[in-house]
Swiss-Prot record:
Residues 1-21 form the signal peptide. Coiled coil: none annotated. Belongs to the bacterial solute-binding protein 1 family. WtpA subfamily. This is Uncharacterized solute-binding protein MA_0280. InterPro entries: ABC_trnspt_W-bd_WtpA (IPR022498), ModA/WtpA (IPR050682). The lineage of its organism: Archaea, Methanobacteriati, Methanobacteriota, Stenosarchaea group, Methanomicrobia. PANTHER family: MOLYBDATE-BINDING PERIPLASMIC PROTEIN, MOLYBDATE_TUNGSTATE-BINDING PROTEIN WTPA.
């Protein structure tokens, strides 16, 4: 991550503190209206799997406002979505990531000129009424439940999906919170090909090998490319527990263990604590623990930037905010932009 993006991360935390305290400040901002522009065209949207439900609703609303326009969405792990553009040369009109930092670190300046932070989330441990020991598990003992030999849990591939590397961060942070220095060893190191080293400054650095070398112990762990692919496994009882975002758990009606704010990557108050763990993906990219913030951009290779601008305006405006609230995911109001001067003018009024 370059210096500019590190500076943006600092100001992002500061600005979220300011704007969350005044959520009504965009009441008078313009909303995208009905238009015939783009009739008969296709709008391609790459987005995080955890955005599938709210983006399905955004798609329906956008298509209602734009008769004849077909919104085609591709859900994937956010890192994988970015690589479709940067490595595979695929074209997208909108890119929405579960970790905004992937945009400055992997896309700017060649593939994108700006990005906006628009929503937050938190990590939880989801389960169902059929999960083993579901009547026992709580915030204080969840890691002990996962240690039991007959319990199977799932998380997404850290190389592909922010929920995957955030699952590793949460588990490592749990060691200091619960004063148990074997939690990560027992749950992750003993059951996968991942390794861990401790830096001189005390930061825990988790190393993720090539995806085929993660080699999970399948009697304990189910690994998939993105976290929402594991939801059906939880529903059918193939796994007992799933590291996932709170919004996804609520959208699917799962029970869940709310993790302590000190480790669930949701709270600005604990940002310094989150930064004590890093994850190095197989491509060498190192991600530092931080509060969960989603980001959106219009890639430079967008084939329909006009419609993309209107879609992002819908996302960032009051309609999009309400959709996210109803789906259990707090919007950032107003959205916070980096590279604002490079944004389409229609979007500049919706961000700070």
């Amino acid at each position: 991550m370059n210096v500019d993006s590190r500076v943006f991360r600092f100001f992002l935390v500061f600005l979220i503190l300011v704007v969350v305290a005044s959520p009504g400040c965009v009441d008078n901002q313009p909303e995208p209206g009905n238009t015939s522009a783009g009739e008969g065209e296709v709008l391609t949207v790459f987005h995080a799997g955890s955005l599938s439900v709210p983006f399905e609703e955004l798609e329906a609303e956008f298509e209602a406002q734009h008769p004849g326009v077909d919104v085609q969405r591709e859900a994937a792990g956010s890192a994988q979505s970015v690589r479709k553009i940067t490595e595979l040369g695929k074209k997208a009109d909108v890119l929405a990531s579960a970790d905004y930092a992937l945009i400055p670190s992997l896309m700017v300046p060649e593939y994108a000129d700006w990005y906006a932070a628009f929503a937050r989330n938190q990590m939880i441990l989801a389960y169902t009424n059929e999960s083993k020991y579901g009547d026992e598990i709580n915030t204080d003992n969840w890691y002990e439940i996962l240690r039991r030999p007959d319990v199977r849990y799932g998380f997404s591939n850290p190389n592909d999906d922010p929920a995957g590397y955030r699952s590793q961060m949460v588990t490592q942070l749990a060691e200091s919170y619960y004063n148990d220095d074997m939690i990560y060893d027992d749950l992750m190191l003993a059951n996968t090909g991942m390794t861990l080293t401790t830096e001189e400054n005390g930061t825990a650095l988790i190393h993720v090998p090539a995806s085929e070398e993660i080699s999970p112990n399948t009697s304990k762990i189910m690994l998939r490319s993105m976290e929402v692919e594991l939801s059906s496994a939880l529903e059918t009882g193939e796994i007992d527990y799933l590291y996932i975002y709170r919004s996804v758990a609520e959208q699917h009606g799962f029970e869940y263990v709310a993790l302590p704010p000190a480790i669930d990557l949701s709270s600005l108050e604990y940002a310094d604590n989150y930064s004590k763990v890093q994850v190095e993906m197989v491509n060498g990219e190192v991600v530092t623990g931080s509060p969960i913030v989603y980001g959106v951009t219009i890639p430079n290779n967008a084939e329909n930037s006009e419609l993309a601008t209107e879609f992002v305006a819908l996302l960032l405006g009051e309609t999009g905010q309400q959709i996210f609230i109803e789906n259990g995911q707090p919007p950032i109001v107003p959205a916070i932009a980096e590279g604002k001067d490079s944004m389409p003018e229609e979007l500049q009024a919706l961000v700070v």
